[in-house]
From Swiss-Prot:
Coiled coil: none annotated. It is found in: Cell membrane. Belongs to the UPF0056 (MarC) family. It is a multi-pass membrane protein. It holds the Pfam family MarC. This is UPF0056 membrane protein PYRAB13050. Keywords: Cell membrane, Membrane, Transmembrane, Transmembrane helix. The chain crosses the membrane at residues 8-28, 49-69, 73-93, 111-131, 140-160, 181-201. One of its GO terms (cellular component) is plasma membrane. Its main location: membrane.
Length: 201
């Protein structure tokens, strides 16, 4: 049981760093700041459900994607590690997402899906990670991790106002840098594991 909890904690911290919902708070609040609290919570719920469904879908069909494209898990780990390393370096610089939203032609429901849920939170890095998790870890633990991330996304976005009040943009940048450090170390390890597997080292 202790080993299961340890694995869950490691996977959760890694996926939380990649999705970085705290870093998405300023953009989320910029879109919903004019809404009543209950409406903000509705949008946060739509974002979290979309994140959950997206990550679960790719986690469950990932092995067929590998087969279809004739890609090995090790090759995918190397490519994914490079992608995550780049993301981690951007986060280490304290860069907040530069996703732009044109509010004139879209509804809040559409914004909740694109770009807030995809690709801001459940982007290529998160999708790559859950697919690799499923090949290397116990599927029930991976699924539990994804569900926990979905719940975390909702709680953080629904509390966006309080988070900005407590942390401010500087605090959010510091948090983003911390997540970037975790992500960069994960990426390097992913690349090392991929190289070892590919060359039988």
């Amino acid at each position: 049981m202790l080993e299961v909890l340890k694995t869950f904690a490691v996977l959760y911290v890694g996926l939380f760093a990649i999705t970085n919902p705290v870093g998405a708070v300023p953009i989320f609040m910029g879109v919903v700041s004019h809404l009543a609290p209950d409406k903000r919570h509705e949008v946060a719920e739509k974002v979290s459900i979309t994140v959950l469904v997206t990550l679960l879908t790719f986690a469950l069909v990932g092995k067929w994607i590998f087969k279809f494209f004739g890609s090995s898990v090790d090759a995918f780990a190397i490519a994914g590690g490079i992608l995550l390393f780049r993301m981690g370096m951007e986060m280490l610089s304290g860069k907040l997402s530069s996703v732009k939203i044109d509010e004139e032609d879209v509804t809040l429901e559409e914004v909740a899906v694109i770009p807030l849920a995809i690709p801001l939170i459940s982007g290529p890095g998160a999708i790559t990670t859950v697919m690799l998790y499923m090949t290397r870890e116990s599927p029930p633990i991976v699924i539990a991790t994804i569900i926990a991330i979905g719940i975390s996304v909702y709680i953080i976005l629904a509390s966006g106002n309080k988070i900005i009040e407590k942390l401010g943009r500087v605090g959010i940048k510091v948090t983003t840098r911390m997540m970037g450090l975790i992500l960069t170390s994960m990426a390097i390890q992913m690349i090392i594991n991929g190289i070892k597997g590919a060359f039988g080292i």
